[in-house]
């Protein structure tokens, strides 16, 4: 299955709780932390919900 690189580029301070939960669910912990996640509908949904905090490649 294809993978997607996701990087947290903005702080989580003051963000909605469900957006923080989506970022945590993707495995991101701090700014400029990058993870590779599988390109599934579940992960795409989390990325789309918190898109303004993330940079997505691939």
UniProtKB/Swiss-Prot annotation:
The superkingdom of the source organism is Bacteria
**Stretches assigned to coiled coil:** none
Report the CDD domains cross-referenced here.
Answer: Ribosomal_L30
GO MF terms held by the record: structural constituent of ribosome
Q: Which PANTHER family match?
A: LARGE RIBOSOMAL SUBUNIT PROTEIN UL30M (PTHR15892:SF2), MITOCHONDRIAL RIBOSOMAL PROTEIN L30 (PTHR15892)
What the record says about family reads: Belongs to the universal ribosomal protein uL30 family.
Q: What is this protein called?
A: Large ribosomal subunit protein uL30
């Amino acid at each position: 299955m294809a993978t997607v690189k996701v990087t947290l580029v903005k702080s989580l301070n003051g963000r909605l709780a469900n957006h923080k939960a989506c970022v945590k669910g993707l495995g991101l912990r701090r700014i400029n932390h990058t993870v590779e996640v599988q390109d599934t509908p579940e992960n795409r949904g989390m990325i789309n919900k918190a898109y303004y905090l993330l940079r997505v490649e691939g």
